[in-house]
From Swiss-Prot:
GO terms for molecular function: ribosomal large subunit binding. GO terms for biological process: cytoplasmic translational termination. GO terms for cellular component: cytosol. It is found in: Cytoplasm. This is Ribosome-recycling factor. The gene is frr. InterPro entries: Ribosome_recyc_fac, Ribosome_recyc_fac_dom, RRF_sf. Keywords: Cytoplasm, Protein biosynthesis. PANTHER family: MITOCHONDRIAL RIBOSOME RECYCLING FACTOR PSEUDO 1 (PTHR20982:SF3), RIBOSOME RECYCLING FACTOR (PTHR20982).
Amino acid sequence: MINEIKKEAQERMGKTLEALGHAFAKIRTGRAHPSILDSVMVSYYGADTPLRQVANVTVEDSRTLALAVFDKSMIQAVEKAIMTSDLGLNPATAGTTIRVPMPALTEETRKGYTKQARAEAEQARVSVRNIRRDALAQLKDLQKEKEISEDDERRAGDDVQKLTDKFIGEIEKALEAKEADLMAV
């Protein structure tokens, strides 16, 4: 019973950390990375389709993404979708390839993205703490129902706290890495 609660808490905290990684991937740095375009949706025969389903995104060099669109009639729609996204990118079409140069980040945009990264990290921290609270409440309920002793509850609570500290530490490391990435010129 106790192990199930701890395992569930660990899985949920792991998912929170994974979600933070996805959120950080959407925050643009000065370098080209295919995941930057993950949020772009293309109007494909009337339906909004993720860009990855209509084009192959590769890194051409450190500041340029290259897109190979599968259906040549979709080149205009893909280009328009990238332009209208809130990423601030200006694609250039060369034949069947769309090149997306990454503009250099200004000091102001770097600070804005850093602020956004900190907000995402804080949201992840709050989520991890809520998971801890839920796990501790489940343990307290078990103790009230006399299914576990007070000592077992305290030990399991300490384990949940250690797990929380571990994941908060990982969130901090991820945030530091993202901030360093954003501030690198």
